Amino acid sequence: MGRAVGIDLGTTNSVVSVLEGGEPVVIANAEGSRTTPSVVAFAKNGEVLVGQSAKNQAVTNVDRTIRSVKRHIGTDWSVAIDDKNYTSQEISARTLMKLKRDAEAYLGEDVTDAVITVPAYFEDSQRQATKEAGQIAGLNVLRIVNEPTAAALAYGLEKGEQEQTILVFDLGGGTFDVSLLEIGDGVVEVRATSGDNELGGDDWDQRIVDWLVEKFQSSNGIDLTKDKMALQRLREAAEKAKIELSSSQSANINLPYITVDADKNPLFLDETLSRAEFQRITQDLLDRTKTPFNQVVKDAGVSVSEIDHVVLVGGSTRMPAVTELVKELTGGREPNKGVNPDEVVAVGAALQAGVLRGEVKDVLLLDVTPLSLGIETKGGVMTKLIERNTTIPTKRSETFTTAEDNQPSVQIQVFQGEREIATANKLLGSFELGGIAPAPRGVPQIEVTFDIDANGIVHVTAKDKGTGKENTITIQDGSGLSQDEIDRMIKDAEAHADEDKKRREEQEVRNNAESLVYQTRKFVEENSEKVSEDLKAKVEEAAKGVEEALKGEDLEAIKAAVEKLNTESQEMGKAIYEADAAAGATQADAGAEGAADDNVVDAEVVEDDAADNGEDKK
């Protein structure tokens, strides 16, 4: 059995964590960072880039770079690249595949299982799509866990067995959640949760972009939103400015050559954004976090004074205005500073993976469903079977009847939401129960059962008590993928993984070959006096052979040329070694002679004629 990891699949960044000796460890990616940008790019040469490498080339490859795909998960969104449509699940799977690959490189063994986190306010279709993304990435998704719950799990287990009420304020790159939990004696119980799936750090970035566009247009008369590359540069500059304003009172945004005027003269963007101005243009976004907060406190039935700890989650909570608002909402309570807002969710997910695999004992996680679930009944009314903030897993049944005489079937339409009129809520799916025996209206008894599993995914069954006939569906949104589609995407992802691996190996061979040529020539230059001209020529010929092979696409030819250069280099090394050894011996002889000279008496040498006569002169 392979290892299990915890994954925080974020809008902006993603994190993977694993249990090592019972302790959660955040795994650094191949680039050495503990967070991986949730960015996927399709390079012109066919290579799929994920993470920092994808983010780095976004400006020059705008149309083929996808970011913040989490905002589209569970919808019918797709993106066309090279005449192929990619769903949000497939793009998310690319990020998950990189996290899986980096974890395997760190652990030295296969990663097969994962707990993946989602915003607490995610609907059923979004949870289902996240699970599908994990499957496409080759992961067995043990559980879908709410992000605030995972954060509380990571935070709470460090605090011992004392019972406490924790508020988790989670403002990420694309979503916002707030949850109230009770923790104690190994039990993490969610009391209430609320949120906004359309609110996150991306929106703060966009306000800065809009501000810059307006400033530039007023001074230059040019709308930068019409220029895709300029817009991408603005987005990147806005994100940096937002981060800078968390620690500084102002941020300078300088973008040279942002565009050209009508006469093709280059134009520069140079603006200074103060923290006060930034807070002014984003105040309404901040205000939107208040309603979910108040709703959670009301639903949980607690007063603000009963909250023991406040935990901030998500990089966007680093903004001073957010911290101040949380303090204001919680009666001046200082948020906990001992938690890394970028990593705590992944750590909690790794702990939950450990619980599910039996590696972590005596921990029970009791999560809730964020929205009410029900069906449409006569008059278009939303009849709720499961109220929001019900602990999951759960199962509820209710008996309904027909509205017309001799009605042969009933249409079951499943909705999620809080509105009294069914159509004002989110339609999760519908199915038909047929074969109802003819009878006056009000006589047939149709039992509808809602079953929510621990992942928060809904299963609905309708059963005619008279005939025993029943029909069951696992709710899938209109964008949901069939098993055949998931299987196809898994195969496609595996094929791309093989292609990517082959491409990486090819690049490594090329890089090593180029490095060998450089190092060999440098070595020859440094030891020029010790190598014969004949040997130098052979080595240079072999080096040119490698360079020639690198111009082509034949990997085996490159390897053969490298092998030849290695052979010639070894001969050169041998010759240099022998030359050094000979020089060493000569020096040793000279030293010995010098030592002998100390006992020699100076005298003239008188040649012996007889000896001369006896010499064989040539």
Curated annotation (Swiss-Prot):
Keyword ATP-binding listed? yes
InterPro entries assigned to the protein according to its UniProt record, in alphabetical order: ATPase_NBD, Chaperone_DnaK, Heat_shock_70_CS, HSP70_C_sf, HSP70_peptide-bd_sf, Hsp_70_fam
Keywords tagged on the record: ATP-binding, Chaperone, Nucleotide-binding, Phosphoprotein, Stress response
- Report the superkingdom from the record: Bacteria
- What PROSITE patterns does its record include? HSP70_1, HSP70_2, HSP70_3
What are this entry's molecular-function GO terms? ATP binding; ATP-dependent protein folding chaperone; unfolded protein binding
Is Nucleotide-binding a UniProt keyword of this protein?
yes
Q: Which SUPFAM superfamilies match?
A: Actin-like ATPase domain, Heat shock protein 70kD (HSP70), C-terminal subdomain, Heat shock protein 70kD (HSP70), peptide-binding domain
Q: Matching CDD domains, A to Z?
A: ASKHA_NBD_HSP70_DnaK-like
**Induction details:** By stress conditions e.g. heat shock.
Any idea what job this protein has?
A: Acts as a chaperone.
Hey, which family's this protein in?
Belongs to the heat shock protein 70 family.
Q: What is this protein called?
A: Chaperone protein DnaK
